[in-house]
Amino acid sequence: MAVVPTRFKLFNKDFMAQFKEEHQKHFPDSEPAIGGFPDAGEGRYSEKLDYKSWIEFNNSMRVHQNFVELLPVIVTFLFVGAFVLPKLAMWIGILNAVARIIYSVMYVKFGSNSRALGAIAGSLPLYVLGLATFGTLAWSTFAH
């Protein structure tokens, strides 16, 4: 999401040039990767960023990591919910996608204290879907 443009903006060719000599000493047949790979915000390349750039990159990385961590939960809730309540699952999936965009933009632009709107808007409907799915399954199982 937001990490790729931020990565290439901060770890551009000019920035990576400062690592060329050391890199070629250890890897003579290659150049340092533009984009700062494999640095994830706490490595050798990030140490050379100014404070503002480091915060910007780390906020982008945290948004990315949060998305990666929650993706299995989101997909599982939507997959199971779609068998029981397909229209509700569809709308919650759309709402979650919009909420993830809001979460990403707020976190990257304004920092971690501004992510609450997107986090709540994305998580709460998933829990509602989970409860509705469980309730529907329980009702259909035990009502007879």
Residue spans for each PLM region:
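Transmembrane alpha-helical segments that form the membrane-embedded catalytic/substrate-channel core
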Residues: 1-9, 97-104
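Membrane-interface amphipathic/juxtamembrane segments adjacent to transmembrane helices
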Residues: 4-53
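Short, amphipathic, aromatic/basic-enriched membrane-interface segments that mark the entry/exit
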Residues: 57-66, 90
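Core segments of transmembrane alpha-helices
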Residues: 65-78
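Membrane-embedded alpha-helical transmembrane segments of multi-pass integral membrane proteins
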Residues: 72, 95-103, 125, 129-132
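Transmembrane helix-loop-helix
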Residues: 83-95, 108-117
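Interfacial loop-to-transmembrane junctions
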Residues: 102-128
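Juxtamembrane boundary at the C-terminal end of a transmembrane helix
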Residues: 131-144
